[in-house]
From Swiss-Prot:
Chain residues that bind heme b: 202
Family annotation (CDD domains): secretory_peroxidase
Gene this chain is encoded by: PER47
Subcellular location: Secreted
Organism name: Arabidopsis thaliana
Family that this chain belongs to: Belongs to the peroxidase family. Classical plant (class III) peroxidase subfamily.
Active site per the UniProt annotation: 77
Full protein name: Peroxidase 47
GO MF entry, a single one: heme binding
UniProt site positions, description: Transition state stabilizer: 73
Residue pairs linked by disulfide bridges in the UniProt entry: 46-125, 79-84, 131-321, 209-235
Length: 325
């Protein structure tokens, strides 16, 4: 009972912090427009939109905290393909296999949260709020719910009409080294600092054995021997067996970076960030200073949320997030 009270009290404190942050943004002249988007986009047309999304996210995460990682991963897998246009939500049809049915996306979770928020919003403001905005807001709210930083994002994204399985080949592989990650993300406008900060999202969630078992077949000096035994034990249950990225799988903190320092990164693409001199100092900095990680992460997430957005005639506002109008 005491633990529950403390968690509820912490939520209240964090809510007050959010209010203070938003007030400070207003006072110092926070940029309310970005790339044709606006912080106040729904102020008149659907003022309850953000609260509805937040309620859907909070209710779902209270029932299943592991879904926080799913919502953050959903945003990344959406935005990195064709931009932040909710293409990841479209279902396959008899004439087209959509992104969500790619092997890279089969483990994505949280679609029902987006559906719930969209249905409730449509009941209040039909045809106004895009699915792309809901995905971006849901990821933001999931970060905060799990204990991470609060950040605001501009709204006004339109939903795309294309979702093809072949486009998912552009998603970064868990087998890339740091130089390859920097190159891949750099092509989309991200810095090495962004790459390391965004990788910190792995402080939440799990990886499946199929994504790291190759590290166990040959000696890997970058992998702690005791942790290697842990991974082997996990994989004994099959390719779909799950291994948490760090010791606090449902808490957004800097434990992920501490794990990398101890050669206990689950994915090759995780551990390479510590093994590579170009990114090691960033890992060490975030492991030492969680506040610095939080600040850089929210900046990188704003950038991710604004990636190649569609505006006006470039897209539409779907009535149902799973199909085009």
């Amino acid at each position: 009972m005491l633990t529950r009270f403390k968690k509820q009290n912490n939520k209240m404190v964090r809510a007050n912090i959010v209010s203070m942050v938003l007030l400070m943004h207003a006072i110092v002249g926070f940029p309310f427009h970005a790339r044709g988007l606006s912080m106040t986009y729904y102020m008149m047309s659907c003022p309850f939109a953000e609260q509805i999304v937040k309620n859907s996210v909070n209710n779902a995460l209270q029932a299943d905290p592991t879904l926080a990682a799913g919502l953050i991963r959903m945003l990344f897998h959406d935005c990195f393909i064709e931009g932040c246009d909710a293409s990841i939500l479209l279902d396959s049809t008899k004439d087209n296999t959509a992104e969500k049915d790619s092997p890279a996306n089969l483990s994505l979770r949280g679609y029902e949260i987006i559906d719930d928020a969209k249905e409730k919003i449509e009941n209040r403001c039909p045809g106004v709020v895009s699915c792309a905005d809901i995905v971006a807001m849901a990821a933001r709210d999931a970060v905060f719910w799990a204990g991470g930083p609060y950040y605001d994002i501009p709204k006004g994204r339109f939903d795309g009409k294309r979702s093809k399985i072949e486009d998912t080949r552009n998603l970064p592989s868990p087998f890339l080294n740091a130089s390859q990650l920097i190159q891949t993300f750099g092509q989309r406008g991200f810095t090495p600092q962004d790459v390391v900060a965004l990788s910190g999202a792995h402080t939440l969630g799990v990886a499946r054995c199929s994504s790291f078992k190759a590290r166990l077949t040959v000696p890997d000096s970058s992998l702690d021997s005791t942790f290697a035994n842990t991974l082997s034990k996990t994989c004994s249950a099959g390719d779909n067996a799950e291994q948490p990225f760090d010791a606090t799988r449902n808490d957004f903190d800097n434990a992920y970076f501490n794990a990398l320092q101890m050669k206990s990164g689950v994915l090759f693409s995780d551990q390479t960030l510590f093994n590579t001199p170009r990114t090691r100092n960033l890992v060490n900095g975030y492991a030492l200073n969680q506040a610095k990680f939080f600040f850089d992460f929210q900046q990188a997430m704003r950038k991710m949320s604004n990636l190649d957005v569609k505006l006006g005639s470039q897209g539409e506002v779907r009535q149902n997030c799973r199909s085009i109008n």
